[in-house]
Design a protein with these regions (language model features):
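Beta-sheet-rich sandwich/jelly-roll-like modules and their strand-loop junctions
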Residues: 26-91, 120-122, 126, 133-200
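Solvent-exposed serine/threonine-rich low-complexity stretches and specific carbohydrate-binding patches
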Residues: 95-107
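Twin-arginine (Tat) signal peptide motif
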Residues: 4-6
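Exposed aromatic-hydrophobic patches
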Residues: 111-119
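Solvent-exposed, conformationally flexible loop/turn segments
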Residues: 108-110, 125
Length: 233
């Protein structure tokens, strides 16, 4: 009866591996959230300020940036892109770590715009700038935007920064940016310990675990029936 025994061991091994994958799928997470806003900063767009950003500091253990968001309102529409770059204390440092497709902000009243990065790996303790810019979408009338902010410095790991760089994106990495003392943008930035750019296996529901245990019980019962039948013959 060596074959059934090996079959049982294989089933148990699969169960152990499955349990291990379930545990590993429970990723750690961390969020920077400076909401709700108590102030606003304007004016974002052409021919006004082309780039608004927020400096953040990556935290050890959760260094994959999965998504971030800004709150924008406008009386017209603004076409822009969202970016992530390293920060050296005064300006952005290449290469570009994340660049969104063209985004369009519309409507009076602050709307939250979220950018999913598919996982950007950051270095713990290092500063980065999350920013929105119209420099690569510098269209006439692409203006009248206001960004939600906080005026009470709620986030110690960075601050609000901006640049009047017009259509010249290269100035962002060659010229010091400006800032408002004590201000942060109203942002939400979500981090995890997932592998950058990788899909994380979903954590199974209790029903899935029940099916697994039921299946293993069925395997054991089937082997026992085979043993009884072999004794009868």
């Amino acid at each position: 009866m060596s074959l059934p025994r090996r079959f049982i061991f294989s089933a148990l091994a699969c169960a152990v591996l499955f349990a291990a994958s379930v545990l590993s799928a429970k990723a750690s997470s961390f969020t920077i959230d400076t909401n709700p806003p108590n102030a606003s900063i304007s004016t974002f767009g052409n021919p006004n300020t082309a780039t608004y950003g927020q400096v953040i500091t990556a935290v050890a253990g959760t260094t994959t940036l999965d998504s971030f968001s800004f709150k924008i309102q406008t009386t017209g529409s603004i076409t822009y892109r969202a970016y992530v770059m390293a920060w050296n204390g005064t300006q952005a440092v290449g290469p570009i770590l994340f660049e969104s497709a063209n985004q369009v902000a519309t409507g009076i009243g602050f709307q939250q715009y979220t950018y999913n990065t598919v996982g950007v790996g950051l270095s713990p303790g290092t500063q980065y700038v999350l920013f929105a810019s119209i420099s690569n979408t510098y269209l006439p009338g692409n203006s009248a935007g206001t960004m939600a902010a906080r005026s009470d410095n709620p986030y110690a790991g960075g601050s609000f920064v901006y640049m009047n760089n017009g259509p010249s994106f290269s100035l962002l990495t060659s010229t010091p940016w400006s800032s408002f003392s004590g201000y942060d943008l109203a942002i939400t930035a979500n981090f995890s310990d997932n592998v950058p750019g990788a899909l994380v296996a979903p954590v199974p529901e209790p029903a899935t675990m029940l099916l697994l245990s039921t299946g293993l019980a069925g395997v054991v019962a089937k082997v026992k029936r085979r043993k009884r039948n072999s004794h009868r013959t």
